[in-house]
Amino acid sequence: MAIYAGIDYSMTCPSICIWDSNKELKFENCQFFFLKKEAKFNKDFKNVHGFLLESYSNDMERFDNASEWAITILNKYNVKKVAIEGYSMGSTKGLIFNIAENTAFLKYKMFKNNIEVITPAPTTIKKFWTGKGNSKKDAMHDALVNKENYNVADLIGIDSLKSPTSDI
């Protein structure tokens, strides 16, 4: 069986889920990784692992640092296939180009490491998990609590569905 990864590659808190398909697909059988600039998240929360975003002097260095972090995790787990969430149709703000450039760094490194990439639309992921393609992030979190009795906000120790909970 194979080891797969799912990636939500945002600018402020990229996150990765690693799943070994020899195990049942459940939250507790996955390893989660996220990258944040706040030092308080730079620790392990059971199977959720926070990393500190390295300082950077320009966007290219930022994109390179984040993609190196991600490719290191993918290679450590010998991931050969990744689903990286596609761009949402509503992404029209000025940062859309930065998001695309940032993601291109990672996609290029995955290509160079022979990692297959698929890009499902955000609506596909939401529909799979909640039954509704236009679900909000809180509905995704509620579905996890209802299906698996797992509360990521409680695990990480934050009060609401803000980042990094909403990114995981």
Task: Name the predicted role of every residue range.
Residues 1-168:
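Phosphate- and other anionic-substrate recognition elements at nucleic-acid/protein interfaces
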